[in-house]
Amino acid sequence: MSLIASIYAREVLDSRGNPTVEAEVYSEDGFFGRGIVPSGASTGEHEAVELRDGDKSRYLGKGVTKAVANVNGAIAEALIGKFDVADQRGIDLAMIALDGTPNKGKLGANAILSVSIATARAAAEEAGLPLYQYLGGPNSYVLPTPMMNVINGGVHSDNKVDFQEFMIMPVGAKTVKEAIRMGSETFHNLKKLLEADGKNTSVGDEGGFAPDFANNEEPLQYLVKAIQAAGYKPGKDIALATDVAASELYDADTKKYKLKWSTGEEFTAPEFEKYIEGLVAKYPIVSVEDPLDENEWDDWVEVTKELGKKVQIVGDDFFVTNTDYLKRGIEMGAANAILIKLNQIGTLTETFEAIEMAKEAGYTAIVSHRSGETEDTTIADLVVATNAGQIKTGSMSRTDRIAKYNQLMRIEDELNQGEPEGVSIYKGINSFYNLNADAKKEIQSHQG
């Protein structure tokens, strides 16, 4: 057991070249941990506050020197010499109390989270354990099924695509290493197909391709072709997933969803639900994220009734990793999965609480990156620590995304001690804890 001896934060850059907070924590026995906080582009309005300076003369107003000062000042004073590095809950609750606001608006969730992660890493080092094992204990052995965002749209790119993400999920793989290989092969075949058709193969924020398409269906067609070109079967081996990010398309005044980057079509909520249902019926889609605006709770209940038995309905902007919103969703029957983003809520403790609440309700928890990422690989350890079963961490390019995949392969090797088969489990299609056997069978039999 070792008390916190020092805390130091600095301003560093994320994958978009914007400032973010990095914190370092040392224990009195010399153990060390570092945490770097990611940042989102498509953010839910109820997320914890990402404290920015607002000084337009510096980093276009996106500096984080105020958050850094809060770590080096108030947070350091409250924690140094008072908490053992292993007291994760005590440390997180102390920072929450010090902030004193419901959304961490005083100190900044970016300030608080950097210390929360750094503390956990220092404690893991002190315990002589890898982070996933320190956080989750000896029963942490489920490797996640990846959601690989290989085509980017919406606010994640500059193209004429409305849906924010088009993803592939290697549901038929036997190991995470095989899943990553399948994803990589499909990604490279997708690039060849796009190039052959004269489409741009530059990549977006999350490493996926971001060419223009005629509509939101064409990317799905390309994904099916890419899966087949890689030698796999759509649905059986690799399923599809999409993040609609519908709040970006919704006009609260007209109560309509507009495909503003592509065709310009407008839909009422029931019409938009039917539009999405049509895509699910036509393609081997296993997961749909944020299909409706984050504030339209009754509409979420309806789409869950209609589609929730067939596919995973994920709340991201809808739940913002917040147990208050998740509890309401569970009670109403809205969504059947939650996207877990550390910086949406701001501490590891609250993140674990959200994952546990989801599991108890039969909701799947999907641990996720943000569009503005860093070299920090905490989410790879977190998803294994919690046996969550699914991870969303970008495409098969950009080091900020690949770092997480590499860490997952290291963890799998470590669990199996280099043997082809060991204690690790990759569940593939069975990582959809919220879907019954018939739904899974239907998805894997769907050829697109």
Curated annotation (Swiss-Prot):
> What are the names of the required cofactors?
Mg(2+)
Annotated signal sequence range: none
Q: Which GO terms describe its molecular function?
A: magnesium ion binding; phosphopyruvate hydratase activity
Per the UniProt entry, what are the Gene Ontology biological process annotations, in alphabetical order?
Answer: glycolytic process
- Does the keyword Magnesium feature in the UniProt annotation? yes
Q: Which residues form the active site?
A: 206 (proton donor), 341 (proton acceptor)
Subcellular localization is given as: Cytoplasm; Secreted; Cell surface
What InterPro entries would the database entry show? Enolase, Enolase-like_C_sf, Enolase-like_N, Enolase_C, Enolase_CS, Enolase_N
Q: What class of enzyme is it?
A: lyase
Q: In which pathway does it act?
A: Carbohydrate degradation; glycolysis; pyruvate from D-glyceraldehyde 3-phosphate: step 4/5
| A matching Pfam family | Enolase_C
Q: In the record's cofactor note, how is the cofactor described as bound?
A: Binds a second Mg(2+) ion via substrate during catalysis.
Q: Name one GO cellular component term.
A: cell surface
What are its E.C. numbers? 4.2.1.11
Q: Which reaction does it catalyse?
A: (2R)-2-phosphoglycerate = phosphoenolpyruvate + H2O
Q: Which UniProt keywords apply?
A: Cytoplasm, Glycolysis, Lyase, Magnesium, Metal-binding, Secreted
Q: What does this protein do?
A: Catalyzes the reversible conversion of 2-phosphoglycerate (2-PG) into phosphoenolpyruvate (PEP). It is essential for the degradation of carbohydrates via glycolysis.
Alphabetized HAMAP family for the sequence = Enolase
Which family, according to the similarity comment?
A: Belongs to the enolase family.
UniProt protein name: Enolase
Q: Which organism is it from?
A: Oenococcus oeni (strain ATCC BAA-331 / PSU-1)
